[in-house]
Amino acid sequence: MIIVSLKEGENLEKALKKFKRKFERTGVSKELKRRQAFVKPSVLRRNQKIHAIYAQKFLQSGD
Protein backbone atom coordinates (compact mmCIF):
# COMPACT_ATOMS: atom_id res chain seq x y z
CA MET A 1 0.00 0.00 0.00
CA ILE A 2 1.33 3.41 -0.95
CA ILE A 3 1.09 6.08 1.74
CA VAL A 4 1.63 9.76 0.99
CA SER A 5 1.95 12.05 3.98
CA LEU A 6 0.89 15.66 3.54
CA LYS A 7 2.45 18.60 5.30
CA GLU A 8 0.37 21.44 6.65
CA GLY A 9 -0.75 23.70 3.81
CA GLU A 10 0.42 21.37 1.02
CA ASN A 11 -1.90 21.38 -1.97
CA LEU A 12 -3.58 18.37 -3.53
CA GLU A 13 -1.72 18.57 -6.86
CA LYS A 14 1.60 18.19 -5.09
CA ALA A 15 0.28 15.19 -3.15
CA LEU A 16 -0.95 13.56 -6.36
CA LYS A 17 2.44 14.12 -7.95
CA LYS A 18 4.12 12.42 -4.97
CA PHE A 19 1.69 9.51 -5.22
CA LYS A 20 2.32 9.05 -8.95
CA ARG A 21 6.08 9.13 -8.40
CA LYS A 22 5.89 6.50 -5.65
CA PHE A 23 3.54 4.39 -7.76
CA GLU A 24 5.99 4.38 -10.68
CA ARG A 25 8.95 3.55 -8.43
CA THR A 26 7.24 0.49 -6.97
CA GLY A 27 6.70 -0.99 -10.44
CA VAL A 28 3.07 -1.90 -9.83
CA SER A 29 1.92 -0.73 -13.26
CA LYS A 30 4.66 -2.69 -15.06
CA GLU A 31 3.74 -5.83 -13.14
CA LEU A 32 0.04 -5.40 -14.00
CA LYS A 33 0.82 -4.97 -17.69
CA ARG A 34 3.11 -7.99 -17.63
CA ARG A 35 0.45 -10.15 -16.01
CA GLN A 36 -2.32 -9.01 -18.36
CA ALA A 37 -0.31 -9.80 -21.48
CA PHE A 38 0.99 -13.26 -20.56
CA VAL A 39 3.46 -14.69 -23.04
CA LYS A 40 4.32 -18.36 -23.01
CA PRO A 41 7.96 -19.04 -22.10
CA SER A 42 8.61 -20.72 -25.47
CA VAL A 43 7.30 -17.68 -27.35
CA LEU A 44 9.34 -15.38 -25.12
CA ARG A 45 12.55 -17.33 -25.85
CA ARG A 46 11.78 -17.30 -29.57
CA ASN A 47 11.28 -13.53 -29.54
CA GLN A 48 14.50 -13.02 -27.60
CA LYS A 49 16.40 -15.17 -30.08
CA ILE A 50 14.96 -13.26 -33.06
CA HIS A 51 15.83 -9.95 -31.41
CA ALA A 52 19.40 -11.10 -30.69
CA ILE A 53 19.89 -12.18 -34.32
CA TYR A 54 18.55 -8.85 -35.57
CA ALA A 55 20.76 -6.87 -33.18
CA GLN A 56 23.84 -8.85 -34.18
CA LYS A 57 23.17 -8.30 -37.89
CA PHE A 58 22.58 -4.60 -37.25
CA LEU A 59 25.85 -4.22 -35.35
CA GLN A 60 27.81 -6.15 -37.98
CA SER A 61 26.44 -4.05 -40.83
CA GLY A 62 27.52 -0.88 -39.01
CA ASP A 63 31.21 -1.82 -39.19
Curated annotation (Swiss-Prot):
InterPro entries attached to this UniProt entry: Ribosomal_bS21 (IPR001911), Ribosomal_bS21_sf (IPR038380)
Example of a GO cellular component annotation carried by this entry: ribosome
Domain of life: Bacteria
Pfam families: Ribosomal_S21 (PF01165)
Biological process annotations from GO: translation
Keywords from the named record: Ribonucleoprotein, Ribosomal protein
MF annotations from Gene Ontology: structural constituent of ribosome
NCBIfam families for the chain: S21p
Protein family membership: Belongs to the bacterial ribosomal protein bS21 family.
Name of the protein in its database record: Small ribosomal subunit protein bS21
Organism: Azobacteroides pseudotrichonymphae genomovar. CFP2
Protein encoded by which gene: rpsU
